[in-house]
Amino acid sequence: MENFGEGRRSGGGMLPLLALSAVAEYYRLPWKPPVTASLLAANTLVYLRPAFIDPVIPHISEVWFNPHLIFKHKDLKRLFLSAFYHVNEPHLVYNMMSLLWKGIKLETSMGSSEFASMVFTLIGMSQGVTLLLAKSLLLLFDYDRAYYNEYAVGFSGVLFAMKVVLNSQAEDYSSVYGILVPTKYAAWAELILVQMFVPNASFLGHLGGILAGIIYLKLKGSYSGSDPVTMAVRGVSRLVTWPLRFLNGMVRSRRRRITGRGRVGRGQTGIAGPGIWRCQSCTYDNSGWLSACEMCGSGRARGNGWSLNQGPALSSSNDLPLDELRRRRVERFS
């Protein structure tokens, strides 16, 4: 999150760098994490505001995270949507590069459904904790202008929460702006250092993200099994993808019905499958729709085969001479 009174968009030319990094990162992955890609796309589209979504999404002036306005107007739009808005390209690119790395790590290890559930939960928790912190500071210390009336936007509060979750089990050390710290406490070091080097950064928003990550881990540890949000995400995912799965099943079913293509077999039985008959001359499996063997041309009607609905047809000879079989194959495929 960053604090700004007014203004928007300064700096440029960094979005191609973000696009190049995302493409390169996804290209090398055997499995492409879809939720991370969707979050990157959503944040970028909200910032760019292309013509096809510009009339639909609110302007940044309508979604600034401002505790005073949220409480005064009960404006939940500011509470949730402000996380997806950024004031300029450096702000967007820095956050999205961080999301790219953290998102891929977490989604790969957790799975898409659980990762989507976690992100959805952390957005609400980080924004909610920040709101409560601002209100508490107002009531306890009369901090009015400093936090309660500030304007902020950005995904960084959620990223701090994700960092806490990602590093919760780490036992090694990490470098934070050149300072070596235990990885599990890296978010706290980054909170202080970011505030030192980026004065406009929202200290309260980042702190709210860290606390949200800690609360999420505590709740997750005390609850066994899938949480309700994960179950809901999985249910919605199954519902949305049902038409695709249905069509995929139909395509596979049609492929299983062999239409004029078979295989050469050596089994003792002549029954190869539903609607399939095996040529006794060359043991090639043919579609039940064919009256002659596709491999050697032997006619099914002359007793050269088995089918699911009939046994071996009676014939005075079950095998053709080898020379005749070779001749028929040459004629068939020449």
From Swiss-Prot:
Q: EC number(s) per UniProt? A: 3.4.21.-
- PROSITE patterns assigned: ZF_RANBP2_1 (PS01358), ZF_RANBP2_2 (PS50199)
The RanBP2-type zinc finger ranges are: 273-302
Top-level EC class = hydrolase
| GO biological process per UniProt | proteolysis
Q: Where is the active site?
A: 156, 206
Q: Which UniProt keywords apply?
A: Hydrolase, Membrane, Metal-binding, Mitochondrion, Protease, Transit peptide, Transmembrane, Transmembrane helix, Zinc, Zinc-finger
The transit peptide extends across 1-87
Classification via InterPro entries: Peptidase_S54_rhomboid_dom, Rhomboid-like_sf, Znf_RanBP2, Znf_RanBP2_sf
The listed locations are: Mitochondrion membrane
Q: Which residues cross the membrane?
A: 114-134, 146-166, 176-196, 197-217
Q: Name one GO cellular component term.
A: plasma membrane
Membrane topology term reads: Multi-pass membrane protein
Among the GO molecular function terms of this UniProt record, one is:
serine-type endopeptidase activity
To which protein family does this belong? Belongs to the peptidase S54 family.
Q: Which PANTHER family match?
A: RHOMBOID PROTEIN 2, RHOMBOID-RELATED PROTEIN
Q: What does this protein do?
A: Probable rhomboid-type serine protease that catalyzes intramembrane proteolysis. May function in the heat-shock response pathway.
Provide the protein name.
Answer: Rhomboid-like protein 14, mitochondrial
Q: Which organism is it from?
A: Arabidopsis thaliana
